[in-house]
């Protein structure tokens, strides 16, 4: 079970130049494909005069949703090296965009691979990397007389309280590290009037 993952906390910018071609790299924390589409549209608009706007992203704690795009560069010379930097740093929930201004000299496939890899690496180096926990949200409904027992378990296990309502039937929404979720569910479900 994946319990934690690495992502970037802050944006990072990188730069690489080779034979008068300029590579501007931007790393962003993202959590949805919609965020990615919005950011890409903004970069294409802002750098409308650039030859290529290549990118790669990785989403989710399991790192199963990803994509690499060469945007007209020779196949696998731009998106794959960018994605390779994401993988080698074991990051997720990240988008790296590399904007290329053509300098008039062809770099060849190996030159392009190095340039996109180095630009992406520089963007990651200028971003703050953090480790986050994978959390699970638990909703528990209970009768009011069980309040003290529920709150004792909450105090002991220290989940984050998202919301709580108190009435004849009470409800509490908790967020806890995924590896501890089953234990919390078990302890709550074993409560009874005594």
Feature map (PLM): residue ranges:
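A common structural junction motif
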Residues: 47-50, 157-162, 189-194
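Active-site beta-strand/loop microenvironment that shapes enzyme catalytic pockets
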Residues: 78-126
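Short glycine-/aliphatic-rich beta-strand segments at the starts of folded cytosolic domains
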Residues: 128-144, 172-174
């Amino acid at each position: 079970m994946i319990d934690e993952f690495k992502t970037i906390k802050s944006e990072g910018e990188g730069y690489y130049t080779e034979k008068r071609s300029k590579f501007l790299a931007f790393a962003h924390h993202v959590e949805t494909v919609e965020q990615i589409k919005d950011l890409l549209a903004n970069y294409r608009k802002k750098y409308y005069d650039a030859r290529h706007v290549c990118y790669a992203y990785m989403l989710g704690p399991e790192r199963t949703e990803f994509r690499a795009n060469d945007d007209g560069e020779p196949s696998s010379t731009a998106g794959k090296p960018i994605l390779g930097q994401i993988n080698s740093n074991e990051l997720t929930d990240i988008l790296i965009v590399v904007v290329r201004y053509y300098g008039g000299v062809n770099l060849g496939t190996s030159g392009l691979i190095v340039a996109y890899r180095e630009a992406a690496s520089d963007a990651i180096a200028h971003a703050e990397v953090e480790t986050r926990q994978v959390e699970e949200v638990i909703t528990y409904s209970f009768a009011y007389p069980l309040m003290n027992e529920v709150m004792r378990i909450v105090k002991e296990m220290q989940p984050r309280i998202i919301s709580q309502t108190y009435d004849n039937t009470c409800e509490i929404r908790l967020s806890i590290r995924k590896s501890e979720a089953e234990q919390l569910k078990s302890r709550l479900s074993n409560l009874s009037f005594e």
